[in-house]
UniProtKB/Swiss-Prot annotation:
Transmembrane annotation, as ranges: none
Entry GO CC: cytosol; endoplasmic reticulum; endoplasmic reticulum membrane; protein-containing complex
Gene name tied to this protein: Tab1
Species annotation: Mus musculus (Mouse)
Subcellular location: Cytoplasm, Cytosol; Endoplasmic reticulum membrane
Gene3D superfamilies reported for this sequence: PPM-type phosphatase domain
Protein name, entry field: TGF-beta-activated kinase 1 and MAP3K7-binding protein 1
Phosphoserine modifications at: 7, 421, 436
Positions of modified residues (Phosphothreonine): 429, 440
PPM-type phosphatase domain ranges (all copies): 28-365
Length: 502
């Protein structure tokens, strides 16, 4: 009967009520599922995707964003995404609320979600206890007679139903102020455009066994913080705060590492950061799951993932026409860097045999989008676009962005060099300053100052530094291929024969 009741409740949840909530079109999401690589470099999915996200706006101009990273199944992340929306978007927040009110509502919402999930598995836990009482005591499961096989199968199904947990990072925008609530290891970054470049700030702290504040909290409960830090994980996870995971919530006294705790050591209480004023800010907000920055750290080493991801987003803003495309391009790029590092067999390959699900949410605050998004820019009136292929060296790093330039031929009367008419040339000619920037990074704790420049080689600095040897004819192999340019020029001007590059 309990199983039938749960099945009915689950069927009633399809489709989700959140399907009718208005989406925020000032944000975009990209994602990739987990991968494990075999010796030949082929990747396969280790488990069904466990990440989730949300990006909604309410009628009272409140915006809600979230990225959720699950483990041991996706039930918890799905539950949290739906229930948290209900606890924050049904009138609980409004423009009359003070900063203290918003923080209180966020804390209350996480508490309700945690309690509601644990209550939702009560029936399964009761059924599990009932079935376990029917098994003979002291007999290992693999030695049980065949008549207990159905009970064992049902116990396995129940374990899958009640297992798992989730980490969450949530952002609320209300009254031009940003609030971030975090449980676990997902991250929130605020990237601001300044006169000195792109300022990258991590708004939350990772709740891990490396976090000294978390280790102190656990030590106050009577636990050995040094041993926890040495172990690095608690019941298979680095996080010290999580939603769900009934095993560590209900059974921590049976876990050697946690048994001495005076109260529940693994909690779902979020840390609230903010309010962060957004008036006059130009930039973007980043919410990302642990899998994204961990994959990049595996390939490039720890310490610079935030800055690298922010720089990738900055580059894609100039190339893409939608925020979804921006986020997906960055996720795809990190995924490619990770797989290429494994395939290279180099020093970092041993750190890249697999990666978890990756999710990236980007919320725009007036940052220029799509300045170089068109593969063939619109020419000035009377002009024509002639492509010029500029191949980068095959030896370049996969973390750099290759660029295809387009040469816009102006109409007569416009000057190519020096001054030009103010009619349309500025709009027609793409700006290249955002492509393949040189980043100057200065990091202190969670704050990073990132400056972009192209003065030390510009777009072509990835060209090999050594001189290319001349060929048999005494000429160096051309760097820029004008063949397509000459062909189109000849067609437009009625030439009988197609010119070729010298």
């Amino acid at each position: 009967m309990a199983a039938q009741r749960r099945s009915l409740l689950q069927s009633e949840q399809q489709p989700s009520w959140t399907d009718d909530l208005p989406l925020c079109h000032l944000s975009g999401v990209g994602s990739a599922s987990n991968r494990s690589y075999s010796a030949d470099g082929k990747g396969t999915e280790s488990h069904p995707p466990e990440d989730n996200w949300l990006k909604f706006r309410s009628e009272n101009n409140c915006f809600l964003y979230g990225v959720f990273n699950g483990y041991d199944g996706n039930r918890v992340t799905n539950f949290v995404a739906q229930r948290l929306s209900a606890e924050l978007l049904l009138g609980q927040l409004n423009t009359e609320h003070t900063e203290a009110d918003v923080r209180r509502v966020l804390l209350q919402a996480f508490d309700v979600v945690e309690r509601s999930f644990l209550e939702s598995i009560d029936d399964a836990l009761a059924e599990k206890a009932s079935l376990q009482s029917q098994l003979p005591e002291g007999v290992p499961q693999h030695q049980l007679p065949p008549q207990y096989q159905k009970i064992l199968e049902r116990l396995k199904a129940l374990e899958r139903e009640i297992s798992g947990g989730a980490m969450a990072v949530v952002a609320v925008l209300l009254n031009s102020k940003l609030y971030v609530a975090n449980v676990g290891t997902n991250r929130a970054l605020l990237c601001k455009s300044t006169v000195d470049g792109l300022q990258v700030t991590q708004l939350n702290m990772d709740h891990t066994t490396e976090n000294e504040d978390e280790l102190f909290r656990l030590s106050q409960l009577g636990l050995d913080a040094g041993k926890i830090k040495q172990m690095g994980v608690i019941c298979g996870q680095e996080s010290t705060r999580r939603i769900g995971d009934y095993k560590v919530k209900y059974g921590y006294t049976d876990i050697d590492l946690l048994s001495a705790a005076k109260s529940k050591p693994i909690i779902a209480e979020p840390e609230i950061h903010g309010a962060q004023p957004l008036d006059g800010v130009t930039g973007f907000l980043v919410l990302m799951s642990e899998g994204l920055y961990k994959a990049l750290e595996a390939a490039h080493g720890p310490g610079q993932a935030n800055q690298e991801i922010a720089a990738m987003i900055d580059t894609e803003f100039a190339k893409q026409t939608s925020l979804d495309a921006v986020a997906q391009a960055v996720v795809d790029r990190v995924k490619r860097i990770h797989s290429d590092t494994f395939a290279s067999g180099g020093e970092r390959a041993k750190f890249c045999p697999r990666h978890e699900d990756m999710t990236l949410l980007v919320r725009n605050f007036g940052y220029p989008l799509g300045e170089m998004s068109q593969p063939t820019p619109t020419p000035a009136p009377g002009g024509r676009v002639y492509p010029v292929s500029v191949p980068y060296s095959s030896a370049q790093s996969t973390s750099k962005t290759s660029v295809t330039l387009s040469l816009v031929m102006p109409s007569q009367g416009q000057m190519v060099n020096g001054s030009h008419s103010a009619s349309t040339l500025d709009e027609a000619t793409p700006t290249l300053t955002n492509q393949s920037p040189t980043l100057t990074l200065q990091s202190t704790n969670t704050h990073t100052q990132s400056s972009s420049s192209s003065s030390d080689g510009g777009l072509f600095r990835s060209r090999p530094a050594h001189s290319l040897p001349p060929g048999e004819d005494g000429r160096v192999e051309p760097y820029v291929d004008f063949a397509e340019f000459y062909r189109l020029w000849s067609v437009d001007h009625g030439e009988q024969s197609v010119m070729t590059a010298p």
